[in-house]
UniProtKB/Swiss-Prot annotation:
PANTHER family: S-ADENOSYL-L-METHIONINE-DEPENDENT METHYLTRANSFERASES SUPERFAMILY PROTEIN. It comes from Burkholderia mallei (strain ATCC 23344). It is an enzyme of class 2 (transferase). This is Ribosomal RNA small subunit methyltransferase G. Its EC number is 2.1.1.170. GO terms for molecular function: rRNA (guanine-N7-)-methyltransferase activity.
Length: 232
């Protein structure tokens, strides 16, 4: 056994991950069925399996994937509830499918579209869609600013969300043409992004800024909702 092997942390069992997921979801106030929990654990397994091929995340440990990716993504679910049980969401710069795949599992009545410019990441997203049997999930490859409602995507979206995609002002500028009436843009951030907020373009303003607490994660997390004049 090599030194590296001796130092490598043991891989958590599915039962351990399931307990961590159940406790975390309960702490977040997100109700999940057995099938939904199973799908989220299957998604973690897919991320771990295909990470070396698709370069999806710097995190290699499934336990940390569950905390830093799944629970982190689940933390926004209660705050998106105002859009109802049947909203349309676009996940911009989705990468390995975060938070969009998690939203599609946790909110089965929603129609979720994943967007990325990297074809191999879109390939993984389609793989996840097929293996997890997510009929409410779709994938579109290309720059968000070039997507046309009614052509590249079916229509405008009630929710446009990103997780560490870009500077907040850039995100709003690139995606605002895709926001449906009554919809808004949601940005998942680490530390409170006051400087980014100060650079928001005309006609865009922060509607709410929510400090998130993610179970088992000792790091700052904020969720910013931006409303637009043209979508009110």
């Amino acid at each position: 056994m090599t030194v590296q092997q001796r130092r490598r942390p043991p891989i958590a069992s599915r039962e351990t991950l399931q307990a961590l997921l159940s406790e975390g979801a309960q702490a977040l106030g997100v109700a999940l069925s057995d099938a939904q929990r199973g799908a989220l654990l299957d998604y973690v397994a897919l991320l771990a399996k295909w990470n070396a091929v698709y370069n999806l995340t710097a995190i290699r440990d499934p336990r940390q994937m569950l905390i830093q990716h799944i629970l982190d993504s689940l933390s926004i679910v209660p705050h998106l509830g105002a859009h109802g049980a049947a909203a349309a969401a676009l996940d911009v710069g989705s990468g390995g499918g975060l938070p969009g795949v998690v939203l599609a599992i946790a909110l089965p009545g929603w129609r979720v579209t994943l967007n990325d410019i990297v074809h191999k990441k879109s390939a993984f997203q389609n793989q996840a869609k097929a293996e997890l049997k997510l009929g409410n999930l779709s994938v579109v490859t290309g720059r968000v600013e070039t997507l046309r409602p009614g052509a590249d995507v079916p229509a405008k979206f009630d929710v446009i969300v990103s997780r560490a995609f870009a500077d907040l002002a850039d995100f709003v500028t690139l995606a605002r043409h895709l926001v449906a009436p009554g919809g808004s843009i949601w940005a998942m951030k680490g530390v409170r992004p006051d400087e980014e907020i100060g650079r928001l373009p005309d006609g865009a303003r922060v509607k709410q800024m929510i400090r998130l607490t993610v179970p088992s994660l000792d790091a700052e997390r904020h969720l910013i909702e931006v409303e637009l004049d043209e979508a009110i």
